[in-house]
């Protein structure tokens, strides 16, 4: 057989200079600052270097004289910081240069431009503000409450230009590809609150029980876009003031119980063309589209949860220890494309097709007593008829397939037993313990089989729920 031989070489470098200063006064006041200068050959020589700094301060309030005699307060600290970090990974090794590909022109070898030069691109910068208070109360309760604002600006993207800027052949006998160019576009903000509580509920000689919970509330917002113009991308519409995780899609009104047809909110500007195409339905004085080509897109919620976090428990009795960990997420929507693909009727292949059992709920006939003017003619939770020829319209991408992303996962259960040291003295061992545990004991979601943990942007992509793992262990100390 013929074997291929290839080689590659690249000329790229990154340099960093770092300075840091720390100051501590009387274990009460702490100050830290840093400055770094980063250089990368990925950028043009005029924009090669970026300067980034950070500063942080904390105040150990418990050390102050006015708090030292407060018995129920064991610790209290206030801290705040601001920092900048540069990123150059959004651009290729030679992204600021015009790149060429080898092709042919009239049967002769030729170099064809593939991307335009980008001498003006610069470092992408992430600026983070963090403010928090933490402490311990009654020698039992630890707490931490923090606010953060992480803002990324001058985001680096490879932008595909219009054909008027030029093109190049991608594959023979196919349409040409647009030229690309790297650009700094947009500013995105991620801000929110982090809360953590941890309590020693029981703490005596035999019994000890620690219980903890933490929660993160996150808001994402697009602060700035090039020229303030929206960017429509699939089922998202990147728009200033909105989140990059917000869904922007067609609204599924329900199923017409007289015909079994899916109904969508009509775009008023497309009413005439919808009527000409036979895709307009008027029910009780309201117009609907029966195909998304004539429907109106609108905001349909976010893939981001309202709150997410974990719950932990550590219980011990003499030589026994039982530890549990749960993770949770509340709010947010997942586009269940896997479920959608199992609900659409298509031509069967040699081995047939797979369908979800819910397809058995498809509309089959006009319900008894239903008329053209019935107030409940539209079933908002209905399943349209199974129709091979109209499946693409009946089961089109819309908010019908958005489902709750909320979940609760029993992440870890671990039981261990340590043999008494008095039993081990005669055999020369310092310690011996046995452990048994289960990971991913169960997952609770809105739809069986859905794995909303898979993706933060709300996709599903036929991913399995995380596998359950059993483990056993033996620890020996000599």
Give residue ranges: language-model regions:
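Extracellular/periplasmic, surface-exposed regions of secreted and cell-surface proteins
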Residues: 1, 7-244, 393, 397-478
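Extracytoplasmic gating/loop element in the C-terminal half of outer-membrane beta-barrel translocons
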Residues: 40, 331-428, 432
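Conserved small-residue
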Residues: 200-303, 334, 343-378
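Short, flexible active-site loops
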Residues: 294-295, 307-308, 320, 393-399
